[in-house]
From Swiss-Prot:
Gene3D superfamilies per UniProt: Bira Bifunctional Protein, Domain 2
Protein's name according to its UniProt entry: Phenylalanine--tRNA ligase alpha subunit
Native source species: Caldanaerobacter subterraneus subsp. tengcongensis (strain DSM 15242 / JCM 11007 / NBRC 100824 / MB4)
Family of the protein in this entry: Belongs to the class-II aminoacyl-tRNA synthetase family. Phe-tRNA synthetase alpha subunit type 1 subfamily.
Record: residues binding Mg(2+): E254
Gene name, Swiss-Prot/TrEMBL: pheS
Length: 339
């Protein structure tokens, strides 16, 4: 039995040293030390030994078991370390190498135009004011000098939520909210979404974007309005741009006007873009109606002001030569990636 134990110890040592994986080590542990392992089978035969042999063989068997256990433990630790080092080497990242560039998104044409207009007016001393898109009918109509029998208040033109709550049809309500909270002098612009009950086609949408402008102070005149809008037109469309004001009607301004700019496509000579007139309409404006000032808590005898509103979507279409408004909202990457 002594020879069997020595031969088993030698064979186990050779096999353990040759093991290349943790799975092989576990198999060898079961082979030699498991319940049905070779060492266990040898030990079961100790009952046939004489009383003198049992202590000697028992001690030798324990030494062999301890040796095999230690060798398995050492080999397991070494293999685990080697596998860890190999894995680290395989997954090594050279932090000195340049990273892969991210594919960044870019701004939508409406956002590009809105940001450019904001920069111009912020440079002229304006600040940005905001208001709710779900608005009270009072701010959308009454406070803007729009009587109850005005056509704009019809259900066919306005999205009503209740009889006195609606989706704002213009950014003008921000004027009133600003004047209620702020004492003159006031110089604000208010960009945002507005809603009207229009059928979708190449030039109409039930959701579009406007930007409102408001100035209120002592001694404000129509000349101030023209001066500010002339500066805007030249900065946005180019220094060569000319402007033209035409009389118009808005219930919340008096006098009122629409402003045209010389066609930037043909320089005012006449082309398809401007309808061969040489001019393109871009916004409506006027002096704030005394009733609007009064309803906002501002004395019209002391203060005057001007307001203007422009359609961001329309200006974006003009600037980029877009002929169909629907392209701005269809999320067609072939179109959007051009900007």
């Amino acid at each position: 039995m002594e020879e069997l134990l020595k031969e088993l110890s030698k064979r186990a040592e050779e096999e353990i040293l040759k093991a290349k994986s943790l799975q092989e080590i576990e198999s060898l542990r079961v082979k030699y030390l498991g319940k049905k392992g070779e060492l266990t089978q040898i030990l079961r035969g100790m009952g046939s030994l004489s009383p003198e042999e049992r202590p000697v063989i028992g001690q030798l068997a324990n030494d062999v078991r301890e040796k095999i256990e230690n060798m398995i433990l050492e080999r397991r630790e070494k293999i685990a370390k080697e596998e860890k080092e190999r894995k680290i080497k395989e997954e090594y990242i050279d932090i000195t190498m340049p990273g892969k560039p991210y594919k960044y998104g870019h701004k939508h044409p409406i956002t590009l135009v809105m940001d450019e207009i904001k920069r111009i007016f912020l440079g002229l001393g304006f600040s940005i004011a905001e208001g709710p898109e779900v608005e009270l009918a009072y701010y959308n109509f009454e406070a803007l000098n729009t009587p109850e029998d005005h056509p704009a208040r019809d259900l066919q033109d306005t999205f009503y939520i209740t009889s006195d709550i609606l989706l704002r049809t213009q950014t003008s309500p921000v004027q009133v909210r600003t004047m209620e909270k702020t004492k003159p002098p006031i110089r604000v612009i208010s960009p945002g979404r507005v809603y009207r009950s229009d059928d979708i086609d190449a030039t109409h949408s039930p959701v579009f974007h406007q930007m409102e402008g408001l100035v209120v102070d002592e001694g404000i005149t129509m000349g101030d309005l023209k001066g500010v809008l002339n500066v805007f037109a030249k900065k946005f469309f180019g220094e060569q741009t000319k402007t033209k004001f035409r009389p118009h009607f808005f219930p919340f301004t008096e006098p009122s006007a629409e402003m045209d700019v010389s066609c930037f496509a043909c320089g005012g000579k006449g082309c398809r873009v401007c309808g061969y007139t040489g001019w393109i309409e871009i916004l409506g404006a006027g002096m704030v109606h005394p009733n609007v000032l009064r309803m906002s808590g501002i004395d019209p005898e002391k203060y005057t002001g001007f307001a203007f509103g422009l359609g961001i979507d329309r200006i974006a279409m003009l600037k980029y030569g877009i002929e169909d408004l629907r392209l701005l909202f269809e999320n067609d990457m072939r179109f959007i990636e051009q900007f």
